[in-house]
Amino acid sequence: MKIFDVVIIGGGMTGLAFAAALQSSGLSIAIIESNPPKGFSLEQFSPRVSALNLASSQWLEELGAWQGIAQQRVAPYDAMYVWERDSFAKIEFNTQGLGVPQLGHIVENELIRQALWERVAQQKTHEILLRTESSSLVRSVSNADVQNPVDFLTALPRSLGVTDRNAILTLEDGQMLSAKLVVGADGANSWVRKQADIPLTFRDYGHSALVCHVQTEQPHTHCARQVFSSDGVLAFLPFAQENYCSIVWSLPPEQADYLLHCETSEFNKKLTVAFDHKLGLCQLQSKRYTFKLTARYARNFAQNRIALIGDAAHTIHPLAGLGVNLGFQDAKMLAQAILANEQLGVDFGEYRYLRHYERNRKVEAAKMLLVMQGLKDLFSGDHPLKKLIRGLGLSATDKMGLVKEQLIKQALGL
């Protein structure tokens, strides 16, 4: 049996950031991941992007991963413009008076993951357990090999058991791992959450999200834009190139499915109209993808020997791609709790030492879920009175400098 201090299930952005945060702890850590990154290419754009707020980019810099991101492709944005179609409702945010150069950065998820993977792979205290397509190959690669400076083993988790003193993982190849703490960073359909019998509250948003990349006739001027309509939300997130954007279009499933399969020319027309011609003619530049939107909230974020972070604990509506910031804050707080309790010489895997993390992050996730649901409900429906109230409310807020400043500071994570 292999013995570790922490075993992380899931090598996505949140799980890898959590591992990187423990780099100076001296703890032994294993990461179990079935789909390692294949390398990042500047030749093409990956479909999913995130809007990293200031707190997230600063933390990635502390972890030593931001340099790897910035050297590749990152798009800072310094303004955000939100409006409602066929209404006078609008609000605009910028960096004025904040003392920061930008509101955040638009970064492709695969680039964030690749940079974190390379950062974690350089650390000798981590062992990466991977399922490979070809065989049960085991090989060691020195840290001088920047391609794959990790140990590769074929592995997927098969069962999870918990005792008072440790958690026991059995892998599909028969290996057994022991850990003080197992961290579920394995996404919305978390295997860890299911194994731990943690109940899940969820709500179907009744929408699907369509994502793709487009070229716009007019430059985006490093402004993130979002338009609400009676049946959906459309966000344009600026890329580094001045006429390229990633879009996230939240729509009823039947509309999303139509837009997924319609002719490119038809898609371009409908997208341009839906965006109120704000950036002129929009032209599709990538494959289109859709995914169902569901809000999820785990009843427990922690229990004895088990903790959940990121989408394993909660998922929110992908308004403007902000969800990853919530997951990074989970990872940061859990890492801080582990490091603090390790210094005190206590068993950080016991539930009593995980309760502070759980209480704090459950509150923050619940607040974000309520805000996202509130925005969706606020802009749903096109009754004239409701549109008037929305218009008056947004326009009034747009003129309240102090209120806007507090709202944007909250979004920045300050």
List each language-model region with its residue ranges.
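Conserved N-terminal helical subregion
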Residues: 3, 74-156, 162-195, 203-208
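N-terminal FAD cofactor-binding segment of flavoenzymes
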Residues: 44-81
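N-terminal Rossmann-like FAD-binding beta1-loop-alpha1 element of flavoenzymes
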Residues: 4-31
